[in-house]
Curated annotation (Swiss-Prot):
Pathway: Cofactor biosynthesis; pyridoxine 5'-phosphate biosynthesis; pyridoxine 5'-phosphate from D-erythrose 4-phosphate: step 1/5
Main location: cytoplasm
Gene that encodes the chain: epd
Gene Ontology CC annotation, any one: cytoplasm
CDD domains: GAPDH_C_E4PDH, GAPDH_N_E4PDH
Entry protein name: D-erythrose-4-phosphate dehydrogenase
PANTHER family the record matches: GLYCERALDEHYDE-3-PHOSPHATE DEHYDROGENASE 2
Protein function: Catalyzes the NAD-dependent conversion of D-erythrose 4-phosphate to 4-phosphoerythronate.
One GO-annotated biological process of the protein: pyridoxal phosphate biosynthetic process
Residue positions binding substrate: S158, C159, T160, R204, T217, K218, R240
Organism (species): Vibrio parahaemolyticus serotype O3:K6 (strain RIMD 2210633)
């Protein structure tokens, strides 16, 4: 049984805990602690009731020291609640934590990861790209087999790299990619304002529900980290739209082979049924963003939107639940880190 602690119980942290149970991975993963500065009552309430993902199927109760996840048998899992702002003070050694899932979005350097290890954790997985000095960045389904025992401080990438990198991999292996551009059409996030208010990014001073808002993105750097051969070959822009969840990615690539739409789509279908099963999905149903809410795949390609211009310019629309899909990949990567360890976790 892999013992994990969740540091930061916001959107991703809560989804990770919920995914442990909804995916059935509670047979493999035991959450022993959650570190969050918020009060236990609010933590329990937001875990039980979620605007985007609905009511959690497990009953949640709490006291001042524990979140309790109840099973139909009457038994429950007691998860220790911590309220510590300094990593060095976290009792990971006493709790015998194997992997810390750091979902704060604040910490992300090698030094931050090593601080968790000094506190007693064996390994650390960050829920965002983090610094360039980390031991590895994993996009599950693409490069998780590169994990080694000595990789102690690891990044799970971002929701958008988890969405687009598997598709880039499939297209490149099948047709050869020369270059590409991406537009991320991303749901609003909690770093935006409900009504106009101050922010150091002037576009993010504006009300999230009233505008399509361009924001900075380093997605191209995330692609280069996984595929160094694509250095300076991809560019990306991102806009936030007035929805609370689910993201669409508009991918355009120039390839080396002359293809038709069906060639591209069939390549994705084949991958979704084989090498990227449970990571990539494919649909031709006339769906909209809400239909992909709570979808555990990293990427869902809408084949009706695939276009080919002049044989070698390919455009695709790729969906993802930027919260739920990513949370499920955090668990997959954590288990892959366990599998790569020489010392049993």
């Amino acid at each position: 049984m892999l013992k994990v602690a969740i540091n930061g119980f916001g959107r991703i942290g809560r989804n990770v805990l919920r995914a442990v149970y909804e995916s059935g991975k509670h047979q493999q993963i035991k959450v022993v602690a959650v570190n969050e500065l918020a009060q236990p009552e609010a933590m329990a309430h937001l875990l039980q009731y979620d605007t985007s993902h609905g009511r959690f199927g497990k009953k949640i109760s709490h006291d001042q020291e524990h979140l309790n996840v109840h099973h139909e048998s009457g038994e429950y899992d007691a998860i220790r609640i911590l309220h510590l702002s300094e990593i060095e003070l976290l009792p990971w050694r006493d709790l015998e934590v194997d992997i810390v899932l750091d979902c704060t979005g604040v910490y992300g350097s090698k030094a931050d990861g090593l601080a968790h290890i000094e506190a007693g954790a064996k390994k650390v997985l960050f829920s965002h790209p983090g610094a360039n000095d980390l031991d590895n960045t994993i996009i599950y389904g693409v490069n998780h087999e590169t994990l080694k025992d000595e990789h102690r401080v690891v990044s799970n990438g971002s929701c958008t790299t988890n969405c687009i990198v598997p598709i880039i991999k499939v297209l490149d292996e099948a047709f050869g990619i020369e270059s590409g551009t991406i537009t991320t059409i991303h749901s609003s996030m909690n770093d935006q304002q409900v009504i106009d208010a101050y922010h150091n990014d002037l576009r993010r001073t504006r009300a999230a529900s009233q505008s399509i808002i361009p924001v900075d993105t380093k997605l191209h750097k995330g692609i280069e980290r996984i595929f160094p051969k694509f250095s300076n070959k991809f560019e990306a822009i991102s806009v936030r739209v007035p929805t609370v969840n689910v993201t669409a990615m508009d991918l355009s690539v120039t390839i080396n082979t002359n293809v038709k739409v069906n060639d591209v789509n069939q390549t994705i279908v084949n991958a979704s049924q084989c090498t990227l099963r449970n990571i990539v999905d494919y649909t031709e149903s006339p769906l909209v963003s809400i239909d992909f809410n709570h979808d555990p795949h990293s990427a869902i390609v809408d084949g009706t939107q695939t276009r080919v211009s002049n044989g070698q310019l390919v455009k695709m629309l790729v969906w993802c639940d930027n919260e739920w899909g990513f949370a499920n990949r955090m668990l997959d990567t954590a288990l892959a880190m366990k599998a790569s360890s020489q010392v049993e976790l």
